Regions:
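Residue-level signal for inorganic ion chemistry
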Residues: 64, 184, 241
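N-terminal auxiliary segments of SAM/dcSAM-dependent transferases
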Residues: 9-37, 50
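Conserved SAM/SAH cofactor-binding pocket of Class I
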Residues: 67-164
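SAM/dcSAM-binding transferase cores
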Residues: 233-288
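Conserved Class I SAM-dependent methyltransferase catalytic core
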Residues: 53, 177-234
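General small-molecule cofactor/ligand-binding pocket signal
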Residues: 49, 124-126, 224
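Class I SAM-dependent transferase core
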Residues: 29-71
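Mobile active-site "lid"/loop adjacent to the S-adenosyl-L-methionine
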Residues: 154-183
Length: 288
């Protein structure tokens, strides 16, 4: 199902990427009053409604958007879009893209559609299982070799080390199956044009899985580790890959969320406030 909107780690303080405005007072998208909130992202440049419980967008989505290479005219697909945080953040940074928000949960997809409209961003919302096959993608308007950029924040918690959540939506959004990463990257490989870019965020301790999944059809990998602080191991990796590239792997200097006093890094504060992008977004930019 597709719908289109028209254009009309740890922080010591409240994160700049989200200001909780409390529950809304009306009823929308199947949620009763008090069941969802409206939050400010990118220093208030985006206002997003999302469920009060279950999976909620946070700084992973903003960092992913800031690491996504896109330029005006690109067709950009956000796989597993949720309420649209990452894809809409890319659209706020890069004007003139064609944005596709792909989400398996109809309720979240409807929130994403409403969020795009409320923020004046043109976006097509597609209800689709990213793990589905080529026929399902084609029926949804995602033909092979049809997209310039894919970004994704797949479920990445290891089920063997993750305590099951009683909330089905949260479990679906956070816990990976044995084939999640491979199937999502395979879907991106099929959908991207030659030379198209894929950006993803993943657990740092799962980097080996990422490299293995990118082993066929992608090259030019660029990796940016994300640490809570300089004394701690990386907690996330941001990865950009290019379909069909033969370029060698590059590892960028790590991003530290906090300094030694547990104060948010100035660069991170700027990114979360919607001011600027990460190196992965400005190198190896997709498009023709």
């Amino acid at each position: 199902m597709r719908t289109t909107t028209s254009r009309p780690a740890r922080f010591s303080t409240t994160p700049a990427w989200r200001t909780n405005c409390g529950p809304m007072t009306d009823r929308a998208n199947g949620l009763s009053a008090g069941e969802f909130t409206e939050d400010g992202f990118l220093g208030g440049q985006l206002r997003l409604r999302q469920p009060k419980s279950g999976h909620r967008a946070g700084h992973d989505a903003v960092l992913l958007a800031a690491a996504t290479p896109a330029r005006p005219g690109d067709r950009v697909a956000d796989f597993g879009a949720g309420v649209g945080a990452a894809g809409l953040a890319v659209a706020r940074r890069v004007a003139g893209i064609t944005l596709l928000l792909v989400e398996i949960a109809p309720q979240l997809a409807e929130l994403a559609r409403g969020n795009a409209s409320a923020n004046g961003i043109a976006a097509e919302t597609i209800v689709l299982d990213v793990s589905g096959g080529a026929d399902a993608f084609a029926a949804a308007g995602l033909a092979p070799d049809s997209v310039d950029v894919v970004l994704m924040n797949p479920p990445f918690n290891d089920p063997a080390r993750h305590r099951a959540s009683p909330q089905a939506a949260r479990e679906l959004a956070h816990v990976a199956s044995a084939t999640t990463l491979e199937s999502w990257i395979g879907a991106a490989r099929r959908t991207l044009k030659s030379g198209g870019a894929l950006s993803l965020i993943w657990r740092a301790d799962g980097l080996a899985e990422v490299l293995a999944a990118f082993g066929r059809g992608f090259g030019g990998l660029a990796i940016l580790p994300v640490h809570g602080d300089a004394a701690s191991p990386a907690i996330r990796v941001l990865v950009r890959a290019t379909k069909g590239s033969k370029a060698p792997l590059q590892i960028y200097p790590a991003l530290m969320l906090n300094d030694e006093r547990a104060v948010p890094n100035k660069k991170v504060q700027d990114i979360l406030a919607g001011n600027g992008a990460l190196p992965l977004a400005v190198s190896g930019t997709a498009g023709s």
